[in-house]
Amino acid sequence: MNTLKDNFYQDWRVFDIIHWGENLLLSNGFNDAKQEIEWMLCDLLKFKRSDIYANIGERISKSNVTDLKEWINQRIKNKPVQYITGKTEFYGHEISVSPHVLIPRPETERLVDVAIDTIKNLSNPKVLEVGTGSGCISIAIGSAKKDANILSLDISAAALKVAKMNTKKNNISNVKFEKLDFLRSIPKGEYDLVISNPPYISKYEIKKIMLDVRKYEPEIALTDNNDGLKFYRRFCDNVKKLIKKRGSLILEVGIGSHPMRAFEIFYSSGFKKIELIPDYNGDLRVLKIEI
């Protein structure tokens, strides 16, 4: 394995560090090496992607080189780039992330699309999110639907701290947070929309997922330590207490057989207005139930 002691340059240009970093990451098995080194470099130098090649011959300060080398070293140890830089983008918003919260995924933007479309014609809709994490879902909905009143729940105080920071950073004022264990209790009130990206990886599958996910992302946000359906049963049992008549429940689902297994939980309980919605790759990733 190559290490950061190899190929130490005394004088670095943008080109040099892209070339060196890309080769180092490639040699350590990272297939998206160029994209990742550009991502880190943009964050470090406060560049937009287009700025990189407009400044390809510019020299980089010694302190920035030192920082970037440390970041690459962390990446070689499989730490996700988003945790290294401390942020990512979701639905056009910059979202701070830490190992206390799940890294927002592009496929979850489809969940937000469906939610916004569902409540777009409602006045002052009440929205409940279960599983705040970084707050990205509530922030995206709250930004798009400014008259919505959103309550976002999480069992983790550390996650809620990150989410509150993100709402402040994105100037979102219509989201409130509450610490609550949804598997043990439910919030008061009725909502026009309940939305969640719950832990849906089973205790068997969690052992097989990518190392950078398994090693660094919070297990509580990934798996229910059961069959991956515990939260869906909990929603099914309580949905009529939580949602107004003609309201909706929107849930992200996993891959493989998981979407149909989640669908069956609600169908076998008598719910008829159920829809599985594909993401932009054509995979069924959103489950919508109308009450």
PLM regions: where:
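A short N-terminal interaction module
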Residues: 2-4, 8-60, 64, 68
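Conserved Class I SAM-dependent methyltransferase catalytic core
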Residues: 226-289
